[in-house]
């Protein structure tokens, strides 16, 4: 395995771990049992990629290579055990830790999986289709989290929190442009970092899209 392939593998696993952890935390907050925590963690980690692969007419990568499901399940189990044996510690700080960990895990997963969605589209032969590549990147980035929130019966994170899906779209478009001009490695690294930066700035400066609050009724 060359250095570039190793970097991509580590990024892919990091995104899997981050999204699995976010799914497990949501499940714990919804008071699901161990099985529910693991299922939600796995679905969050591989859900977006499976949706992408179905659109591309391919067997989902998570089914062809079980390491992603295994890593997601192991991460979910570890998160469950940490919360289980440190219940008193986390209960006293649940809101602070929940928001912080969700922000970090979701942001990392979003950045990495967005560019890997673009990568999958390029590998499938759609380098010239900017719209499709951006769509695949965004779907891969937000799909797992959307599935997680629907299964947990909570308002989808991508619709109610600081700029989220828009960060994924921007990162996907940038990734496509970098792919064509500078190659795969710069596109994936810079593209993922751009998503993470936009998410950080959105939270730091409270960027939100307009919404109807109901006060004008």
Indicate where each model-derived feature is located:
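Alpha-helical transmembrane segments
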Residues: 150-157
């Amino acid at each position: 395995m060359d250095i570039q392939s190793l970097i991509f593998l580590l990024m892919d696993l990091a995104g899997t771990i981050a999204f699995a952890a976010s799914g497990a935390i949501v499940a714990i907050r919804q008071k699901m049992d161990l099985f529910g925590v693991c299922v939600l963690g796995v679905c969050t980690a591989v859900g977006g990629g499976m949706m992408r692969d179905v659109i591309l007419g391919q067997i989902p990568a998570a089914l062809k290579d079980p390491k992603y499901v295994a890593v997601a399940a192991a991460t979910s189990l570890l998160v469950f055990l940490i919360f289980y044996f440190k219940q008193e510690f986390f209960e006293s700080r649940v809101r602070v830790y929940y928001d912080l960990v969700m922000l970090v895990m979701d942001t990392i997963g979003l950045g990495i999986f967005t560019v890997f969605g673009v990568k999958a589209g390029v590998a499938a032969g759609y380098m010239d289709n900017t719209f499709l590549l951006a769509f695949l990147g965004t779907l891969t980035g937000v799909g797992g989290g959307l599935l997680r929130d629907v299964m947990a019966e909570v308002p989808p994170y991508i619709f109610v929190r600081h700029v989220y899906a828009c960060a994924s779209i921007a990162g996907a478009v940038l990734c496509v442009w970098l792919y064509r001009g500078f190659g795969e490695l710069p596109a994936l690294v810079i593209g993922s970092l751009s998503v993470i930066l936009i998410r950080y700035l959105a939270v730091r400066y409270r960027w939100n899209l307009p919404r109807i609050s109901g006060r004008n009724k």
